[in-house]
Amino acid sequence: MAKAKFERNKPHVNVGTIGHVDHGKTTLTAAISHVLAKTYGGEAKDFSQIDNAPEERERGITINTSHIEYDTPTRHYAHVDCPGHADYVKNMITGAAQMDGAILVVASTDGPMPQTREHILLSRQVGVPFIIVFMNKCDMVDDAELLELVEMEVRELLSEYDFPGDDLPVIQGSALKALEGEPEWEAKIIELAAALDSYIPEPERDIDKPFLMPIEDVFSISGRGTVVTGRVERGIVRVGDEVEIVGIRATTKTTCTGVEMFRKLLDEGRAGENCGILLRGTKRDDVERGQVLSKPGSINPHTTFESEVYVLSKEEGGRHTPFFKGYRPQFYFRTTDVTGTIELPEGVEMVMPGDNIKMKVTLICPIAMDEGLRFAIREGGRTVGAGVVAKIFA
């Protein structure tokens, strides 16, 4: 088969491996890299390159992550793999590697284990939309009934956390045997790649989403009016569009009468661009940093939500001591700090540095938010935690 020429115009999808320690996540990552490079072209990464994950810092948190890329005939994938359980927790909560879908690796010799459950729960909390299961080490299980039982168990576990356990793809394979080049097991990797292609829908691009820009600064320009500046997070704003100012105070509507970038006037501002937006009839005091400019009706302000939080360890520059209920830190959303109070889950008295925990947060003023929004927890400007909005209450 002729190698397909690598082209950048294929849809780009972000995926990653999750699952219990030693169930074969990194071996599977290497197997996918090898088999797809051999079949469709591209560069193969071996186990040691992936396992030796470089250290990254995301919002001051140290995370070890390996990034590899591979291609199928129709798509280009970026794939993340983490060496340790703590790295997964941090990665998923900070959104350092946003996943459009995850490959849950379960060793068929063990079945679901504690971290299998924890990674599924985390995926649910942080909004990983799709999960595909790879049952690994199937070459070591002779009994077909046993494999069937493990598959049922995994499907039930996924259903428990509101994933469609009965309908999602489960591939039974052996990452190690595929990596060693045995054709029947290589075929299972191709099957997994086909499942990624068909089961995970093409992600919506930022530019196609409704317009939103966090406001970083506000200026008054004599004779022209008020300009707000920031980096457009998603969508497009055009001159003449009606926009809403959301968060901190009551929501107001206004019209974009101008877009400028580097002192040049433009017709529109697009996702990823830093621009200034001129607002009709808006006074300098009507807007402040921390609010967002958005397409009307696309986002609402909220104060109370459930979150999944990672608390920085002392080594990461976090707190040296635990915190208790009644803790009142600042929650940093996009461009601003807002004070909030926390409620810990029943039976939890204190939270130690290095823990991850589910907590209910009530802010003193509303912030424009959707489920999946990331935030930092700060004390006097120092980051002590990272979190994600899992569920909005009010």
Swiss-Prot record:
Underlying gene: tuf1
Residues that bind Mg(2+): 26
GO molecular-function term, one example from the UniProt record: guanosine tetraphosphate binding
Region (G2): 60-64
Annotated organism of origin: Shewanella sp. (strain ANA-3)
Cross-referenced PANTHER family: ELONGATION FACTOR TU, MITOCHONDRIAL, ELONGATION FACTOR TU-RELATED
Location within or outside the cell: Cytoplasm
Chain positions covered by the region annotation G3: 81-84
Protein name: Elongation factor Tu
Main location group: cytoplasm
Enzyme Commission code(s) on record: 3.6.5.3
All residue ranges annotated as the tr-type G domain in the record: 10-204
